[in-house]
Amino acid sequence: MNIHEYQAKQVLAKYGVPVLKGGVAYTAEEAEKVALDLAGPVYVVKSQIHAGGRGKGHFKEPSAGDKGGVRVVKSTDEVFSNAKQMLGATLVTHQSGAEGKEVKRVYIEDGCDIKRELYLSLLVDRATSAVTVMASTEGGMDIEEVANHSPEKIFFQAIDQATGISGFHCRNVAFSLGLEGKQVGAFTKLLSALYKCFTETDCSMLEINPLVVTGDGQVIPLDCKMNFDSNALYRHPDIVEYRDEDEEDPMELEASKHDLNYIKLDGSIGCMVNGAGLAMATMDIIKLKGGAPANFLDVGGGATRERVTAAFKIILSDPNVDGILVNIFGGIMRCDVIAEGVIAAAREVSLNVPLVVRLEGTNVELGKKIMVESGLPIISADNLADAAEKVVKAVKEAS
């Protein structure tokens, strides 16, 4: 689960992380009121959307001006005018997709005297099975760009969860960033607090970009992004309250209500599969045969007819879907249940795209019989390669 920048800073503040004073606003009037409570005379107006690259982004609407989604201003009047331009406008960034995201709230924050910009993040490294600190002197840039062009500028520090973070971990990272004197002590306190926050909130990624060193030597997170493990949210009702469903994909949101693992992609062939590994293999072979998957969808091993029907409806709600491939290996999941769910959904939504079904496993013959007797134009496949070839061919012929 993702949260907004201002919410992330609220979480960090609870752990003693120094953050600049600021407040969220939903109208230009509220934005000006927040600014009046800040020290000034420099303020930063920040669009709040679940996408990175806001500062380098652009708005679709000419009325929003030609500046990005993060603007430095020098008066409360400018706070008002810029907030008015941004609120309700559509911000497009390299992470939002071409459709962009509507700005429904802005964060007004005190400006600061920036001497250096650094990069810092904590994440779970599956290669080392440890929480790992990633740091770079190239703050303010996309870390992917740094990794591609200057990988030597990224420093990694793994932390064994059995022992937790220690002073030497913090000093290693501080020295890699070129910090010195009192800055090292300030950074040690900061990183220790970030690690505690990361582990106690079941965070999956905590990114600060940039982490700035101010003119008076303070080390402060200027921007912050936090993602949380959705499987652990039941332990954090306070974090769940930060969820902004308006920022989530409508289809992914609907899928979550039915305990379906769904991720929207850019292709035209919808996929419904049981098991994450088989789902990824299915997407791979669709690409291999010349198609492009429209989604990742794992219905799980214990799906009911109703759940399968819901999955089918979600796939068909994507206007980009020109064909569907159902690939089921029935172990715990029975093939007859899948067949009944697919047929029920196809009839309910008036299926008008090619449908290829590959069934194997428990009750497979019964499942195939149910589909044949349904009278629906379902294309049966014998194996995964055959299924991928048939759905790609059917989509091309139908277009």
Swiss-Prot record:
InterPro entries: ATP-grasp (IPR011761), ATP-grasp_succ-CoA_synth-type (IPR013650), ATP_grasp_subdomain_1 (IPR013815), Succ-CoA_synthase_bsu_CS (IPR017866), SUCC_ACL_C (IPR005811), Succ_CoA_ligase-like_bsu (IPR005809), Succinyl-CoA_synth-like (IPR016102). Its EC number is 6.2.1.5. Succinyl-CoA synthetase functions in the citric acid cycle (TCA), coupling the hydrolysis of succinyl-CoA to the synthesis of either ATP or GTP and thus represents the only step of substrate-level phosphorylation in the TCA. The beta subunit provides nucleotide specificity of the enzyme and binds the substrate succinate, while the binding sites for coenzyme A and phosphate are found in the alpha subunit. ATP binds at residues 46, 53-55, 109, 112, 117. This is Succinate--CoA ligase [ADP-forming] subunit beta. HAMAP family: Succ_CoA_beta (MF_00558). Its cofactor is Mg(2+). GO terms for biological process: succinyl-CoA metabolic process; tricarboxylic acid cycle. Heterotetramer of two alpha and two beta subunits. GO terms for cellular component: cytosol; succinate-CoA ligase complex. It comes from Rhodospirillum rubrum (strain ATCC 11170 / ATH 1.1.1 / DSM 467 / LMG 4362 / NCIMB 8255 / S1). Pfam families: ATP-grasp_2 (PF08442), Ligase_CoA (PF00549). The keyword Transit peptide does not apply. Binds 1 Mg(2+) ion per subunit. Keywords: ATP-binding, Ligase, Magnesium, Metal-binding, Nucleotide-binding, Tricarboxylic acid cycle. Belongs to the succinate/malate CoA ligase beta subunit family. It catalyses: succinate + ATP + CoA = succinyl-CoA + ADP + phosphate; GTP + succinate + CoA = succinyl-CoA + GDP + phosphate. It comes from the Bacteria. Pathway: Carbohydrate metabolism; tricarboxylic acid cycle; succinate from succinyl-CoA (ligase route): step 1/1.
